[in-house]
Amino acid sequence: MLEGAKSIGAGAATIASAGAAIGIGNVFSSLIHSVARNPSLAKQLFGYAILGFALSELIALFALMMAFLILFAFRFFSKKGKLAGAPV
């Protein structure tokens, strides 16, 4: 029962990866439109696009970290909140 709940929780945590992918697509779409309008600002706009990409990707990495924590880190705790297998 607990394993199923952890799998559902990890799956829900990875939904943020889809949002990050949409955000990255929006960042580079805006970059292409902006460079097409004003090619002389291409270098400056590319720097802003890389910053936007990094921040969007950070959300996906945090979601992946949370999914791994849900799946693997919480298995070491018993029902009483103490480490499983630790001396009492």
Swiss-Prot record:
Which terms are listed as keywords in the entry?
ATP-binding, CF(0), Hydrogen ion transport, Ion transport, Lipid-binding, Membrane, Mitochondrion, Nucleotide-binding, Translocase, Transmembrane, Transmembrane helix, Transport
Q: Which CDD domains match?
A: ATP-synt_Fo_c_ATP5G3 (cd18182)
Gene Ontology biological process: proton motive force-driven ATP synthesis
The family line of this record is: Belongs to the ATPase C chain family.
HAMAP family assigned to the protein according to its UniProt record, in alphabetical order: ATP_synth_c_bact (MF_01396)
Principal place of residence: mitochondrion
Assigned EC number: 7.1.2.2
What gene is behind this protein?
ATP9
What is the recorded name of this protein? Answer: ATP synthase subunit 9, mitochondrial
**Which source organism?**
Beta vulgaris
Keyword Nucleotide-binding on this protein? yes
Q: How does it assemble?
A: F-type ATPases have 2 components, CF(1) - the catalytic core - and CF(0) - the membrane proton channel. CF(1) has five subunits: alpha(3), beta(3), gamma(1), delta(1), epsilon(1). CF(0) has three main subunits: a, b and c.
